[in-house]
Every structure is written in C-alpha cells, then in structure tokens.
Swiss-Prot record:
Belongs to the glycosyl hydrolase 13 family. It holds the Pfam family A_amylase_dom_C. Gene3D superfamilies: Glycosidases (3.20.20.80), Golgi alpha-mannosidase II (2.60.40.1180). SMART domains: Aamy. It comes from Saccharomycopsis fibuligera (Yeast). This is Alpha-amylase. The active site is at D233, E257. The keyword Transmembrane helix does not apply. Binds 2 calcium ions per subunit. Calcium is inhibitory at high concentrations. The lineage of its organism: Eukaryota, Fungi, Dikarya, Ascomycota, Saccharomycotina. It is found in: Secreted. Its cofactor is Ca(2+).
Amino acid sequence: MQISKAALLASLAALVYAQPVTLFKRETNADKWRSQSIYQIVTDRFARTDGDTSASCNTEDRLYCGGSFQGIIKKLDYIKDMGFTAIWISPVVENIPDNTAYGYAYHGYWMKNIYKINENFGTADDLKSLAQELHDRDMLLMVDIVTNHYGSDGSGDSIDYSEYTPFNDQKYFHNYCLISNYDDQAQVQSCWEGDSSVALPDLRTEDSDVASVFNSWVKDFVGNYSIDGLRIDSAKHVDQGFFPDFVSASGVYSVGEVFQGDPAYTCPYQNYIPGVSNYPLYYPTTRFFKTTDSSSSELTQMISSVASSCSDPTLLTNFVENHDNERFASMTSDQSLISNAIAFVLLGDGIPVIYYGQEQGLSGKSDPNNREALWLSGYNKESDYYKLIAKANAARNAAVYQDSSYATSQLSVIFSNDHVIATKRGSVVSVFNNLGSSGSSDVTISNTGYSSGEDLVEVLTCSTVSGSSDLQVSIQGGQPQIFVPAKYASDICS
C-alpha cells in the first residue's frame, strides 16, 4: 500500500503529540534569550591559547587542532564588536580518547564521562573564567550538551559499558540496533545513531533512574559553571517526556536540535523544550538565497506556517549554516546573496545564530570541512561580512533597547514578489532579495507603519530617508536594506 508523504508526516507528528504533554513553563530566563544574538563556536577550531594564527589544521584529518576556552576568552572582544550578546560553545565534557575511523572527538559529541571537562579545551577553572569574562561584558554563555548517547570506537555489539561514567552498565542503554528508518519515530528514539565504525550507545532517557541522574547533573553543571543556556543535541532521538523535568532542573533556557524540516513535526517539541532549532525555516531560506533562480513563495509560506504551527516562534533559533550543515558560502560565491542570507537570519523571527567563520566567508561543505580553524583567517575585522553582521546586530540590539515589545513581536511579511521580500518586526523594516550582485530593482513597500515625514535610516549604508506608510526602495547590486527610525541609528551611523 502506498502512503502519501502528507499522511506519513501527519503520523509522525501524531507520535510527538501522543506523548503525555507537559507544557514547559516559560521562565524569565527564556524571556531574556529572546533579545540575544548568538555566535556559535566549535571550541577546538575557534582560537588557540597561544594565539597562534598559523597553526595548521587539516579538517580532513579530524584531529584536535588546539582551540581552547582560554583562546575564546582572548577573542571575546572580536565577537562582542560584531554585536553578539551570547556565545554557544560545543560540548565540554570528557569524550572518548580514541582515534576512530572518523578521527578524534574534537567536536565533543562522543561522551565518556559527564562529570569531567574535556582537558583538550582546558580546565574546569578555564571554563568558569570564560563564563565570568562573558558576564563581565554583559554577554551570556550557552553550552551544547548531549543526553541521547555516549560514544564508542567500533561496532555497537562490542561495547565496554564499564568505561562510561556514570552510566556504566548496559542496563542504562537501549539494546543495540542502528536506525534504518528515520520515518519510524519508535526507531528514531530507541535505536542508535552512528554506524558500525563509530557507535553511539543510546541512553534509556525514558527510565527514571537515567532521568534522575541527568536532572541532578544538569542542575550542578549549570550552577558550577554559571551557564545561562543550553543547546540539547539530537533532541528528536530522546523520549520527549524526559525534557520538561530536565529543563526545569537546569533552570535556564534550552533549545533542542530537532533535525526535521516539517513544522508539523518540529513545532510540537516546544511542548517539552522552550526553544527548537528552526529547521523548517532553514531549508527554504537556503534554497531562496543561494540562487537567483528561486522564487520567494516557498520562504514566505514557511514563515507563515511556522508562525501558525509553533507555540512561540520568538524562542526558535534561526540559522543558515552550522556544524552539521554545509556552510552557506559553499552553496554560492555571490556576495550579495550571502549578505542577504546573513541579514535575514539576524533580522528575522526568533533568536539569530551565526556560525563562527561566517563573518570571514568560510566556505567548507559538509562535516568535516565546515569545521575550519578560524585563526587561519586572521580574525579580520575589515571583512565585508564582519562589518555587515556588526551593523545588522546593531540595528537589532537598538530595536531591543528602544522597544520593549520588539523581542516578543513576530515577523510579518509586508511585501513580496519573486525575488524581493520585505519584512516588518517592531519598527524595523528589512528588505531582502536574491537578485544577485548584478541585480537591481525599485519597489514600493506599503504598510510599513511609519509616519509621513518620519526620519528613517538605512543602517547598512547610513543613508537617511523620509518615511511614510509607502516606502520607496531602490535595490542596487542586490544588497539587503535595513530601515529603522532615526533615533535607533544614533550610535550606529554617528
């Protein structure tokens, strides 16, 4: 019997909904994260303690390259000067030490002991110092964590569970079976990620003894290291009922990785975790901005779908690249398309996430090539993308400061044609396009909410225009445009 894609997705969503629903109580910490702009870091690849900017790092080798907590500390001003208010760092706990078929666990996702810090990145005191240095700059720390699995060099049928801490017995894990059908939610949650070369033993998070240990651990982990937020890896592979108590025990905003592009599947996870990675928006965003041949209709429809399907889109995290997906600059070399994609992430709904190296135009494709050593770029503050991000973040930060409702307001599309999208959030009107570097267009945008004669500033060029309900916009060279009331721009374009 043939089953339609729509019916299949509906059944998957039903499985998510079928769990006993415990709505997450959104605490003030989650409210605080709505106004943040996040810079994502793979610790091993961002900055070295010794400050060396020529140390080799061949991504294909998959070795530790020397990035550290102290290295991050030394480059915090590089991040803050782009306007970021928070960082998200890769997992910090001890991982398996083996040189596997896929190299070492420099990325942090192959756990061995949740109570120890990975010494390749520094000491526990170094991590505490990183949190303190961030807080001294009025910035927040988000740490990536794994609750779904541990790691093992080799096949899953020969695991020595006694090497793990604290889950040192097979009884804490699901029986070995590799996921063969990602459309089967029971398999997705109970079978194992990984393969016969590197197994990822899958924890029984539905068991109260496993959940109790994790809840106690996360409370201490967050408290000991002054962590402000958590990113939860592989969330769709974990029993949903595990999350409400776990998130409450942590006491901080958490965002779950639900690697699925259908909002009917992804959005219900907000019943269990306050934030979710916005994969439903990721796919149409990259498809629209990577080529001049795409129409905006898929993207505008998904903006509407996410707004209606997710209980709180302002707590989703938006992105166009990360450590699991190829860098956007590998999809196109057109600088205006890349600039539009970056600006769209920063000025859209939810919480923006920029992956380290986007500001330097790094262009690695999929893992491991999208995990380059940033120090080889020289941390150039004069790169076009660095300056674009700084101005777009400045516009967003000014809007958050000037308008107490900005962070909770939802994006609306106020104009679109095949190649141009104009959005409004609060008093910020942004115009994006996929015309390409040689493209130009004149458009009239209605329903801006601006008053006749109101002074506006386009922050990327610092040009002043006179506002009205109908805004005349001339797109040149395919560049994005961000309009704000003049009072927002006093520090941006002074």
